[in-house]
């Protein structure tokens, strides 16, 4: 978690943003060069306040929302949100670049979407009332060439691609079993539920 990392003395004076997680990822790969290795990066992504989620160099869309909801126009809020997505794209690229020569698969999922309208933002609305953008969110899966060079991994990835092609809905509740299953972990004592593993179907 980035706040824990950034509170360490070795990071004094550094900006607090998601890119610090990429450095930790790279360090972890160096410290643990062998065996199976799961790394979880808990990002802030596009959580409000949006302007706190990206450095000034990524303020492409302007004017931005620099205050609380009712002090900003809807367009200013959208601009700031879009800037945060631009920085997330950069974060993902740096993550993938760190893993291109590794036997790696990456799952990226947000916990919720965001609604922006009439100078306010919303998320976490109860499911029965939440608008579609809050509860229907994309998931991204990326794999390195080295990972895909193995036939078993290629077959697993094809199953993931089929879910996309067929527009099959997937749910967070199956993410744990799918990350482990698609990564090649096994669990003879039933720790991985194959009915929840996207790569097992």
Regions found by a protein language model. Name each.
Residues 1-201:
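Catalytic domains that recognize anionic headgroups
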């Amino acid at each position: 978690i980035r706040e824990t990392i950034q509170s360490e003395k070795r990071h004094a004076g550094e900006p607090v943003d998601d890119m610090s997680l990429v450095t930790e990822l790279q360090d972890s790969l160096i410290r643990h060069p062998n065996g199976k290795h799961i790394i979880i990066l808990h990002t802030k992504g596009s959580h409000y306040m949006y302007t706190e989620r990206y450095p000034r160099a990524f303020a492409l869309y302007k004017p931005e929302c620099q205050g609380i909801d009712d002090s900003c126009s809807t367009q200013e809020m959208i601009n700031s949100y879009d800037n945060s997505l631009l920085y997330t794209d950069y974060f993902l690229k740096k993550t993938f670049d760190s893993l291109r020569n590794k036997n790696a698969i990456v799952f990226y999922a947000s916990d919720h979407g965001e609604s922006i309208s009439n100078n306010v933002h919303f998320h976490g609305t109860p499911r029965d009332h939440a608008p579609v953008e809050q509860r229907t969110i994309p998931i991204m899966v990326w794999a390195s060439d080295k990972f895909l060079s193995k036939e078993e991994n290629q077959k697993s990835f094809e199953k993931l691609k089929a879910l996309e092609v067929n527009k099959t809905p997937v749910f967070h509740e199956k993410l744990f079993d799918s990350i482990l299953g698609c990564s090649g972990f096994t669990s003879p004592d039933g720790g991985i539920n194959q009915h929840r593993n996207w790569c097992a179907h």
